[in-house]
Design a protein with these regions (language model features):
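N- or domain-start disorder-to-order transition segments that initiate the globular core
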Residues: 1-12
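M16 family metallopeptidases and their MPP-like homologs
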Residues: 11-44, 48-100, 111-120, 126-155
Length: 167
């Protein structure tokens, strides 16, 4: 691991943290790809450790600290922001995101329903349909380059989420 500290005079009341690891979505199979891509949304909706997203907001009341996971094709990352007095809280959130991610079936089901509703609306938009065709033709029906669809969302498997997150 490599730690870089860079003090600046830009914002004296803010501390930023960035953690980046190699791998990202490239470590996942084609079948796992879209579940991996949705992982930051799942994390945001589910909370961490023993805290649901709602409980976590209550615990962080009065504090300025957050950590948000993200994933790209070749990297996984976590970004954090806090006030100087809340550095310990931000580091605790980082630790929980690494060691105790939370996966709540109800939250994942809600995310799935939301995506399906958005896709149903998008199917009536000619721009969406055109973009879908352009993407298919441009990338030769590559499973990692197709636009998300109801078929893909319906294949989401809650039981696979912890294993995908660990990769």
């Amino acid at each position: 691991a490599k730690v870089v500290v860079k003090p600046t005079t830009f914002k004296a009341d803010e501390v930023r943290l960035g953690v980046v690891g190699k791998g990202g979505l490239s470590l996942l199979s084609d079948e796992e790809y879209y579940m991996g891509e949705m992982m930051p949304a799942v994390n945001s909706m589910s909370g961490v450790g023993k805290f649901s997203a709602t409980e976590l907001k209550k615990q962080l009341s009065g504090k300025t600290a957050s950590v948000q996971p993200s994933v790209e094709n070749y990297t996984s990352a976590m970004g954090g922001v806090c006030s100087p007095k809340d550095i310990e809280t931000m580091l605790q959130l980082l630790y929980l995101n690494f060691t105790q991610p939370r996966f709540n079936k109800d939250d994942v089901d809600n995310l799935t329903k939301m995506l399906l509703a958005q896709l149903a609306n998008a199917k009536s938009n000619p721009d969406f349909l055109m973009q879908e065709k352009v993407t298919d033709v441009t990338y030769g029906h590559n499973p990692r380059r197709q636009m998300i669809s109801t078929e893909i969302v319906n294949k989401f498997d809650f039981e696979q989420l912890p294993g995908i997150y660990a990769k």
